[in-house]
Amino acid sequence: MKVRVAIIMRGLVALAALCCGAAHAEPGYYVVTVYDDPGVKTVDFRYWTVKPRGSSEITWPEVGLGWNVNGRWYTELLASYIGASKFATRLDTLNWQNDVLLTQGQYPFDLAIHTLLIRPQHPASGYALEFGPALQTDVGRTQLNFNVFFERGFGSLSAQPAELSYQWQMRYRWTRWLHVGAQGFGEVGPWDHWLPHEAQSHRAGPALFGSIPAGPGTVQWQAAYLAGKTYAQRGNMFTMRVKVDF
């Protein structure tokens, strides 16, 4: 559960029954990885779904434009939409992501600082800032990622305490064009006073990754199916992402 809970809930009155009267986190974000591709630009397409047990499926299609400004700084503007069987898909948030790489191979791991500014599109909704360290290392042909993020609300969301979440990923370079692995995400509640375990959200599952040459650039894709808890309830998630680098 995170500050983003309130952002989503203000726009999901039709799904109030799902929320059981409490705030719940937006559970779908993608594993932040360390970038080191100076000058590369990206068109970013994302799509993910959440299917809580006994409730209708919620979908989040997203589209973004990214730019590796140099060997240390990646920035992206992202529009996130939301939809369900009970209402039409609409613009939900505008997001600005910035990742700054602090190390470049001089240590056994690479460290980046990640920030994400989240601006909801419904009235009187405030905004939120996600920030924290992103770690990446390689063990043989396996890439490992682990990230810890804090999220703080401002404006009408300022009453929400700063929340703590985590991400992890294992990615084995099986062939040149296909990698296999796993991903996991979780939200534990306020950073300095974790929720009871039964009220936390944790989910994990298998993931596939691939890349396809496309003229002067590359099309990269990934997909994952995660099981566990979303909204502190049992529910499954499917995520898919396609990046066109040029």
What residue spans do the PLM features occupy?
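Cleavable N-terminal export/targeting peptides
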Residues: M1-Y29
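Transmembrane beta-barrel domains of Gram-negative outer membranes and organellar outer membranes
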Residues: H24-F246
